[in-house]
């Protein structure tokens, strides 16, 4: 399979599941589902991007939400090595060699890609519950390494990973989420919860909005606010 630049989109206006027992997990409706997957590359690098949106979702015993958006992008991958990896996957079922040998070739190809390092980001993510909202952004990178096995990659991952995350959410989303889950808090109880979260996450508070910043580098996490 030759890597091609372009996009694939899937749009579904409505999905509804109704069980005889309306309290069955999964019963409900999803509206305005959109999924987009894209590939971008130049002469030496390739990147992949996924975007998902849900206009509204209402399921039994799960707090309903709307205007859900989630995005994730991986970039600066070695184009030739990614192509080789997909070629191995395609040949895997037709290969006349031992399964263990095929799996090892695929693993080695995967490690070769990761060892070159890459960058990633997840921007403009959001969700709304009632009039409340939450937003999140993430940027980071995996630094180059020299891992020869999956075990060593897992072991070294904390020192190879760097990221910065920013989360913003308001008082109303917590109140609405708890109410839809069947739990009602007084304004005083909700305020105590927010104060506790502010201290635990070292969050910055602006009125009814909490902002949390996290940086992870050299295997250590620190709060930025």
Regions found by a protein language model. Give the residues of each.
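Glycine-rich, small/hydroxylated-residue low-complexity segments
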Residues: 1-225
């Amino acid at each position: 399979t030759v890597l091609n630049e372009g996009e694939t989109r899937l749009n579904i206006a409505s999905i509804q599941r109704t069980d005889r027992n309306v309290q069955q997990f999964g019963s409900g409706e999803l509206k305005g589902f959109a999924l987009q997957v894209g590939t971008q590359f130049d002469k030496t690098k390739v990147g992949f991007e996924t975007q998902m949106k849900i206009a509204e979702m209402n399921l039994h015993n799960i707090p309903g939400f709307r205007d859900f958006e989630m995005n994730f992008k991986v970039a600066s991958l070695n184009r030739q090595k990614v192509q080789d990896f997909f070629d191995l996957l395609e040949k895997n079922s037709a290969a006349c060699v031992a399964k263990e040998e095929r799996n090892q070739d695929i693993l080695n190809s995967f490690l070769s890609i990761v060892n070159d390092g890459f960058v990633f980001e997840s921007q403009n993510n959001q969700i709304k519950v009632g009039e409340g909202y939450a937003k999140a952004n993430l940027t980071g990178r995996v630094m180059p390494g020299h891992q020869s096995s999956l075990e060593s990659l897992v072991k070294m991952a904390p020192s190879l990973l760097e990221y910065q995350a920013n989360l913003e959410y308001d008082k109303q989303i917590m109140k609405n989420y708890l109410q839809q889950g069947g739990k009602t808090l007084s304004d005083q109880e909700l305020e105590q919860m927010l104060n506790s979260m502010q201290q635990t996450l070292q969050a910055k508070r602006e009125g009814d909005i909490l902002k949390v910043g996290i940086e992870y580098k050299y295997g250590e996490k620190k709060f930025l606010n």
